């Protein structure tokens, strides 16, 4: 069986969690497919596509249109589409739907319906339209959690299977041998800072977290923010100033290499995920796997992934978040318990397991003997 995986998101200026998903799924599919299978990557036309190279995956092959014309074309129909494949998997709603070849579409969240205020009006319209097309024209829709599945069933009429396939933790996030040196180079002390990792956009709740740091009971620890700016003009220095915090209390590092992220996770007092809305919340899983206590909002997807192994506070509640951070930072036994439970919970997820389930789905959709 020949599977064409769309890797255009990997080349986006802000790949985000969906870009990591595409890379990890591609690599895991290539590693688990077995004899008679082939995975190839496909992108829009770019002069350079080296950023979308995934070990074990063919290509990436370039379609004949640049990104913007390709988006416009796929809003209307299935062409141009990957050639010489039996099935196409689109890891975002941008997909060549409507042709004869089966197309699987991953939908990462239901935010366009549940929290439209956290997207641009144009983004809401586009995602609703493309996810709606997937619901009616895809061979299957894949979602990362039961929470997303429930919302899609509530808001859409699905004419195809809706399949929940969890995510995993990148092997590149293994704690490096020079973790202490990497932390020191950033001016950080192991166990002496809080960490949050997310694309900087309104729904990630960074305003809530910064406000919580100024609240009663919050630990007197610096906050390290890892992630690229997204939409919405999230101005971290302005948030810090508005909260009355010293300028150095919050440090923004932007996007960092995986080795640095692993080192940052390994030294954090806690990983904080205060999102207003998520579909999976990959940082929660990454934190638990790294042996870091995790504090999240009570967004349904985050609670589902945490599986009772995180500290949960109400979405948007700065007072509760401040108190929770204070408890975690001040209670060594609680931290040990969270680490133990988190590692156990994280072991339930893997990219290998996700890829195995996806191959099962592909074989259900492609006629026997194809490829």
Region annotations inferred by a language model:
Residues 1-371:
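Carbohydrate transferase catalytic cores enriched for Leloir-type hexosyltransferases
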């Amino acid at each position: 069986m020949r599977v064409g995986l769309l890797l255009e998101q990997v080349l986006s200026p802000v790949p985000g969690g969906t870009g990591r998903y595409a890379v990890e799924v591609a690599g895991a599919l290539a590693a688990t497919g077995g004899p008679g299978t082939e995975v190839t990557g496909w992108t829009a036309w770019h002069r350079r596509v080296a950023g979308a190279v995934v070990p074990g995956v063919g290509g990436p092959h370039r379609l004949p249109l640049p990104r913007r014309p390709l988006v416009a074309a796929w809003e209307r129909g299935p062409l141009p589409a990957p050639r010489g494949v039996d099935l196409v998997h689109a890891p975002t709603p941008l997909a060549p739907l409507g042709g004869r070849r089966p197309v699987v579409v991953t939908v990462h969240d239901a935010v366009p319906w549940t929290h439209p205020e956290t997207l641009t009006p144009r983004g809401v319209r586009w995602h609703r339209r493309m996810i709606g097309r997937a619901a009616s024209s895809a061979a299957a829709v894949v979602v990362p959690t039961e929470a997303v599945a429930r919302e899609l069933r509530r808001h859409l009429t699905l004419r195809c299977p809706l399949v929940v396939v969890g995510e995993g933790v990148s092997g590149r996030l293994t704690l490096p041998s020079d973790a202490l040196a990497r932390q020191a180079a950033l001016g950080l002390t192991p166990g002496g800072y809080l960490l949050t990792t997310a694309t900087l956009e309104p729904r990630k709740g960074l305003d809530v977290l910064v406000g919580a740091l100024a609240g009663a009971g919050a630990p007197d620890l610096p906050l390290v923010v890892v992630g690229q700016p997204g939409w919405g003009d999230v101005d971290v220095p302005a948030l810090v100033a508005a909260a009355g915090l010293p300028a150095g209390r919050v440090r923004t590092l932007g996007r960092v290499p995986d080795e640095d992220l692993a080192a940052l996770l390994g030294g954090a007092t806690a990983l904080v995920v205060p999102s207003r809305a998520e579909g999976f919340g990959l940082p929660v899983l990454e934190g638990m796997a790294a042996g870091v206590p995790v504090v999240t909002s009570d967004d349904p997807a985050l609670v589902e992934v945490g599986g009772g192994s995180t500290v949960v506070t109400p979405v948007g509640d700065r007072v509760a978040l401040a108190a929770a951070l204070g408890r975690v930072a001040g209670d060594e036994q609680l931290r040990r318990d969270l680490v133990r439970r988190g590692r156990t919970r994280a072991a339930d997820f893997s990219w290998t397991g996700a890829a195995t389930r996806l191959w099962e789905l592909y074989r259900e959709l492609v006629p026997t003997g194809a490829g």
